[in-house]
Amino acid sequence: MGGAGTDWLSVGVFAAFTAGVLVLSAMLGRRTSSAGGYFAAHGQVGWFVNGIAFAGDYLSAASFLGICGLIAFWGYDGFLYSIGYLAGWIVALLVVAEPVRRLGKYTFADALNARFRSRAVTVAAAVSTLVVSLFYLVPQMVGAGALIKPLLGLPHWAGVALVGVVVTAIVATAGMVSTTWVQFIKGALLVGLCTLLVGLILGRGFEVRDPGPPRDAPARDVGSVTALPAWAVPGGEPGPDGMVRTEGARTGPLGPVEFLRVFSASEVAAWRTSKVPAPDGTQRSVAAPERIQGNDLLLPGNSPTFRGLRSGSPLDRVDFVSLMVALFLGTASLPHILIRYYTVPDVRSARLSTVAGIGAIGTFYVLTLYLGLGAMTGGRLDTGDSNMAAPLLARGFGSVLFALISSVAFFTVLGTVSGLVLAGSGAVARDLAAAALGRLPEERMQVRVARIAALVLGAGAMALGLLCRDLNASFLVGWAFNVAASANLPALLMALFWRRATGAGVAAAIVAGLVSSLGWVLLSKDAFEKVYGLPAADALAPFSQPAIVTIPFGAAVGVAVSFLRPRSAQEHPGDGAGHPAGERAG
């Protein structure tokens, strides 16, 4: 930390945010004794509030911390995630928003099972909701742990535990009512503060700075220092160590387009990490600067994830396409996003709230490009933790902005985790409980079970956050989108738009997509290398992102089972346009 004053300021801002969230939840908790209040905020949330809450729910730790970090270290590759995340809202707007609001009530399974009244569909959808929510929870908890040390000086595990405790309090006390307002406030603050930070980046422009005293060696231990690791060079000659120094050269304020033009024409020193043998026989992580042309960093293919785009390997290219497919189709398959449609009063509000959400989310993702490049060329980077790029960039503009950005980043984690825990607890309290009992529990019992489930999910999220602390948040979310799109999208489209779909077919599509995508991810090269610590060559899956295979596989299984298994007596065909039989849009 920069000093005692900065420490206390950060602590004070953080404490104010956290206290405000807890007080809000306690006040709103009195209005959520019914299932309608707890799971859907009584269906009376305005479309604009819901739209900004969509942004607060969707713009997770991966969006803010992970993408900014990827851009800060690898350039345009990180922005590819932004493009994929935003494009997915087109599917949400054009395909699922209206029918999900029309058919569902409280959970993802409600909309999926409106036609079939099938226990198999209910159980499959509930299990899928829990698995996807847990997968998505991991990067949020990783982001929380990364933030807590520079913000409060506490260890990683303390950040994970703090998020778990606060989120459990939010969800257990007031459910969707408090979650909606936490997400609305978070979405507005995140977009507003990031806009301010980008304005400061553009106002500063580029400056060639002295990177510090000469180094005795070209590499330093990862994470041992938080240094000024990269700087743009509008001109100049290399010095003895190969670095260009024209100390004090400035561009002055730049517009958004001019900023990218100057960056493209400059040479940038970016840090790269690698592992080297240590004297004791272990592997030691070190970081060293590498000179790269700015225009090269504005092209894809620099990061390990997307390097295959330049390798010419067909499998590497398929891996990239598969990730983009998952990001594009995954948004409309995320249960914690879909249940937000139940909070608005009608179909028109569902559509308008999606448009408002797209506006806020699109604005934010454009800002991430400038945040990441600003961190690369003028901020502070922790070479051992890319997730800290945005908060450390803010520190360069003063302790107040650092405290605000870091607290909002932590608030970002709270908003997303609240939605995920609420989706999972609803699946347990309504769907699994109904399947076990053969009927829905009475409303007060549903709320009671949901609150207990929130406690269990919060504990599970904390455990997973500790196990996966060293992985990049956006990387982990890519896996979550693969699993969500594979398990949920084929089943959702079948249930909403295919007259011949049966309950058995929809349940089979969920199971096939879920099992195949999970199995593929766990057997992939990335899992072997980054999770298990094993050689990537030992992996059984040919590439890491499974959506391009597992989405069609789940759909094929669902279609085949629908043809092979006749419709049961309680099922009805629907009209193939997202309406139950006999119902039309008004």
What are these regions (language model features)?
Residues 1-586:
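Membrane-embedded helix-loop-helix hairpins and adjacent transmembrane boundary segments
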